[in-house]
Amino acid sequence: MKEGTGMVVRSSEITPERISNMRGGKGEVEMAHLLSKEAMHNKARLFARMKLPPGSSVGLHKHEGEFEIYYILLGEGVFHDNGKDVPIKAGDVCFTDSGESHSIENTGNTDLEFLAVIILL
């Protein structure tokens, strides 16, 4: 992609992948990569829509040299933020800075869906 050019990625072009026990978490997670690292000029390494069924989670992990943002689209759960458990729901934004650890768990009765973005420093 050249500087100044746009791009539209059609939903029909996106194939979600299923990951069991992501980062040591519980159950299965569905991840749909929306843009590649190259499309984001190597300034971000992830832009994805995540879906966690009830009881599923992304395990505790640490970010170094990057930060991660979650924007909660649907459902509810718990964001584990450096040892603190914070209830989350649709419309909330979760931020994890470089050097920090986090995980996310679906504690609700419906799917927890969110956008995940990892920006490189």
Curated annotation (Swiss-Prot):
<dbReference type="GO" id="GO:0033609">
    <property type="term" value="P:oxalate metabolic process"/>
</dbReference>
<comment type="function">
    <text>Binds oxalate.</text>
</comment>
<keyword id="KW-0479">Metal-binding</keyword>
<dbReference type="GO" id="GO:0030145">
    <property type="term" value="F:manganese ion binding"/>
</dbReference>
<dbReference type="Pfam" id="PF07883">
    <property type="entry name" value="Cupin_2"/>
</dbReference>
<dbReference type="GO" id="GO:0042802">
    <property type="term" value="F:identical protein binding"/>
</dbReference>
<feature type="binding site">
    <location>
        <position position="61"/>
    </location>
    <ligand>
        <name>Mn(2+)</name>
    </ligand>
</feature>
<dbReference type="InterPro" id="IPR014710">
    <property type="entry name" value="RmlC-like_jellyroll"/>
</dbReference>
<feature type="binding site">
    <location>
        <position position="68"/>
    </location>
    <ligand>
        <name>Mn(2+)</name>
    </ligand>
</feature>
<dbReference type="GO" id="GO:0046564">
    <property type="term" value="F:oxalate decarboxylase activity"/>
</dbReference>
<protein>
    <recommendedName>
        <fullName>Oxalate-binding protein</fullName>
    </recommendedName>
</protein>
<feature type="binding site">
    <location>
        <position position="70"/>
    </location>
    <ligand>
        <name>oxalate</name>
    </ligand>
</feature>
<dbReference type="GO" id="GO:0042803">
    <property type="term" value="F:protein homodimerization activity"/>
</dbReference>
<keyword id="KW-0464">Manganese</keyword>
<dbReference type="InterPro" id="IPR051610">
    <property type="entry name" value="GPI/OXD"/>
</dbReference>
<feature type="binding site">
    <location>
        <position position="102"/>
    </location>
    <ligand>
        <name>Mn(2+)</name>
    </ligand>
</feature>
<feature type="domain" description="Cupin type-2">
    <location>
        <begin position="49"/>
        <end position="117"/>
    </location>
</feature>
<comment type="subunit">
    <text>Homodimer.</text>
</comment>
<feature type="binding site">
    <location>
        <position position="63"/>
    </location>
    <ligand>
        <name>Mn(2+)</name>
    </ligand>
</feature>
<dbReference type="InterPro" id="IPR013096">
    <property type="entry name" value="Cupin_2"/>
</dbReference>
<dbReference type="InterPro" id="IPR011051">
    <property type="entry name" value="RmlC_Cupin_sf"/>
</dbReference>
